[in-house]
C-alpha cells in the first residue's frame, strides 16, 4: 500500500488538565484546616488530587504555583512524556482504504479487465506493481487509457488470485492459504509484486508436506523461487525413504528422482538395496498410475507386474525395453557395489532382471579388484577426506530408533573384513571394530589397524515430515584397532525426540589410484 502519514492529537490526562486549569485561575480550591491540620500536619485538598498528609508547614506542596521539588519533578515528568515518542497503529485506516477504494472502487481512475471480470482501481496504487509502473510511465498506449484489457497467459492464474493480488496493493497484509499459494504466486509474478512474491515463498516454505512438496517444487522452478526449491528438495531427501508414500511416488518426476537418488544426503533407511526396492516401486507407479492400493501391498504388486514383463521381454533387462529406457538415468545413480556385496540382495537384483547384466558385470569386476587390494596390498582404509569420493561413492545406510533404550546392530554386506558394530546407549552412539569378541557371518580382517571415512547424521521429524532437530559429525576419518570402540556422538537429552533416525555414509577402502 502507498505510504501514509498521520498526526495523532492527544487529550491531556485528566489530572494534568485540572492542574493546568488551576494554574490559569491563579490558585487552587482549599478546604479549611481542622483538627490535626492546625498542628502542622494538614491535608491537601487541591482540585484533582486525593487527600494526603503534609509532612510539615501549612502550605500545599501540590499547589501549581509552589516552588517545590515535587512541582519540579512533576514538570520533569510532563516534559519526559512530551518527548517520549508514541506509536499508535490506526487499525481502521488500512481497512477503510481497502473497503472504500478497492472493494467499492470509489474515485477509480482506471478499469482493469481480465478473465471476464472487471476491477475499478487507481493508478497511484497500481504503480506499486512493476508491471503497471512500466506501463504508465513509458510511451505505451495504455498509459493514457482508462480501460485496460489484461492478457493472462498463465493457466495457474484465476480470478480469485487476481483479486488477492490487486487487493494487496490496498492493504498492509494478506492472508494466503496453502491451497491458493501457487495461483497467487503466479499472479504476483505476472504483476511483478515483489512483496507478495516473497510472502508466497515464505508460506510455501512453512507448509511443505507430502501433499504440497511436488507442486511447490515445480512452481518454485517455474517462478524462480530458488529458496523454496531448495527447501522442497531437502524435505524429499529427508522423507523419501523414512516416510514412504504411494501418492508421493506417483507425483515424483524422473528429473527430481534422479537428483534424490544421486545425492549422498538421501536419508536412507537400512541399506542401498532398499533404495533399489523403492525405485522399483516408484517406476511401477509411474507406469501404472491407476494402481490404487496401500503401501504394504505395493511391493508385492510391483514384483508381480515386473514378473509378467520378463515373460514378454525374455532375455532383455527391463531398463533396455522401450518402457524402461526413460528410467535409465535414475537407476544409473544406484551404488550397485553395496547391493552385490550381500548375497541375498545380489540374487534378487539378478532375478528381477530390471538392471542390465552389463551394469552388474562391471561392478563385480570392480569389487573383486578392491577385495584383492584389501587382502594383498596392505590396504588399511582411507587416510584422508576425499569429499568427492564420499559424495559420489560412499555406502549409504540408516536405522530408525522407535524409542529410547539400548540398541546394537550391524548393516548387512561384505565390507572388506571390517565388521562394524553400532551401539546406541545412554545418549551415546558408539562404533566398534569387531574381530574376535562377537560372532560374524563373514570373514574378518585381523590387521592391527583399519581406517574408515564416515559421516553420521541424526534427525527427528514432526508429523508433516518437517525437521525438528538434527546433528551431524561431518566427514571424519576413524582408525580402530582390533575390537576397539569409539564414541562418535554424544547426544544432548534436550534433542532426543523419538522416533530418532540415524543415517551414515561409509568408505571402507581408499579409491584405487590411477596410473
Curated annotation (Swiss-Prot):
<feature type="region of interest" description="Disordered">
    <location>
        <begin position="1"/>
        <end position="35"/>
    </location>
</feature>
<keyword id="KW-0221">Differentiation</keyword>
<dbReference type="Pfam" id="PF00651">
    <property type="entry name" value="BTB"/>
</dbReference>
<feature type="modified residue" description="Phosphoserine">
    <location>
        <position position="66"/>
    </location>
</feature>
<dbReference type="GO" id="GO:0005634">
    <property type="term" value="C:nucleus"/>
</dbReference>
<keyword id="KW-0744">Spermatogenesis</keyword>
<feature type="region of interest" description="Disordered">
    <location>
        <begin position="65"/>
        <end position="85"/>
    </location>
</feature>
<dbReference type="InterPro" id="IPR011705">
    <property type="entry name" value="BACK"/>
</dbReference>
<keyword id="KW-0217">Developmental protein</keyword>
<comment type="function">
    <text>Possible function in spermatogenesis. Enhances the degradation of MDM2 and increases the amount of p53 probably by modulating the nucleocytoplasmic transport.</text>
</comment>
<dbReference type="InterPro" id="IPR043380">
    <property type="entry name" value="Gcl-like"/>
</dbReference>
<dbReference type="GO" id="GO:0016363">
    <property type="term" value="C:nuclear matrix"/>
</dbReference>
<protein>
    <recommendedName>
        <fullName>Germ cell-less protein-like 1</fullName>
    </recommendedName>
</protein>
<feature type="short sequence motif" description="Nuclear localization signal">
    <location>
        <begin position="85"/>
        <end position="91"/>
    </location>
</feature>
<dbReference type="GO" id="GO:0042802">
    <property type="term" value="F:identical protein binding"/>
</dbReference>
<comment type="subunit">
    <text>Interacts with TMPO-beta, TSG101 and TFDP2. Interacts with EMD.</text>
</comment>
<dbReference type="InterPro" id="IPR011333">
    <property type="entry name" value="SKP1/BTB/POZ_sf"/>
</dbReference>
<feature type="short sequence motif" description="Nuclear localization signal">
    <location>
        <begin position="49"/>
        <end position="55"/>
    </location>
</feature>
<feature type="modified residue" description="Phosphothreonine">
    <location>
        <position position="68"/>
    </location>
</feature>
<dbReference type="GO" id="GO:0007283">
    <property type="term" value="P:spermatogenesis"/>
</dbReference>
<dbReference type="InterPro" id="IPR000210">
    <property type="entry name" value="BTB/POZ_dom"/>
</dbReference>
<dbReference type="GO" id="GO:0007281">
    <property type="term" value="P:germ cell development"/>
</dbReference>
<dbReference type="Pfam" id="PF07707">
    <property type="entry name" value="BACK"/>
</dbReference>
<keyword id="KW-0539">Nucleus</keyword>
<feature type="compositionally biased region" description="Acidic residues">
    <location>
        <begin position="67"/>
        <end position="76"/>
    </location>
</feature>
<feature type="compositionally biased region" description="Low complexity">
    <location>
        <begin position="11"/>
        <end position="29"/>
    </location>
</feature>
<feature type="domain" description="BTB">
    <location>
        <begin position="108"/>
        <end position="178"/>
    </location>
</feature>
<keyword id="KW-0597">Phosphoprotein</keyword>
